[in-house]
């Protein structure tokens, strides 16, 4: 039974992470210094440090910028809370919701300055300090956003 659980966890992982120790799973980390909170799916301990893995289930085998932002925030929060070295590359493992197949994609994470700038922009928009915020490129990007109702009043296609 244990062997089948390990096989399922490792299914879809890149070869370099198969057999690696799971350092953290489904855990929340905080960076008080940068005022960030992130819940990571998995982090593996390797000889090069900790490597992040984000698991996604989607009908399309696609990696989005939001995945990179999420993993980049996880990296900052994990490093700040634990002091461990976290790789500036991570993996997004997409499980196809139709076929169940999994495919890993390596991504390069954003730096602290880029994430800090995004956080500052978010805070400015939420507090009304940005007079002309731009809507998301497509309405589907708004589907799960906490601010959808507020934006829907301004951008009629977001409601």
Q: Model-derived features: where do they sit?
A:
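Acidic-basic catalytic patches of nuclease active cores, encompassing PD-(D/E)XK
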Residues: 1-26
């Amino acid at each position: 039974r244990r062997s089948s659980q390990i096989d399922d966890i490792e299914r879809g992982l890149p070869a370099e992470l198969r057999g690696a120790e799971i350092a953290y799973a489904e855990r929340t980390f905080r960076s008080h210094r940068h005022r960030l909170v992130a819940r990571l799916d998995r982090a593996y301990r390797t000889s090069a440090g900790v490597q992040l893995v984000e698991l996604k289930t989607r009908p399309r085998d696609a990696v989005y910028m939001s995945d990179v932002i999420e993993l980049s925030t996880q990296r900052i929060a994990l490093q700040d809370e634990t002091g461990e070295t976290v790789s500036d590359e991570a993996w997004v493992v997409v499980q196809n919701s139709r076929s169940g197949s999994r495919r890993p994609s390596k991504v390069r994470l954003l730096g602290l300055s880029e994430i800090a700038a995004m956080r500052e922009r978010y805070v400015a928009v939420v507090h009304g300090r940005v007079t002309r915020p731009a809507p998301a490129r497509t309405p589907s990007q708004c589907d799960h956003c906490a601010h959808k109702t507020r934006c829907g009043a301004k951008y009629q296609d977001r409601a």
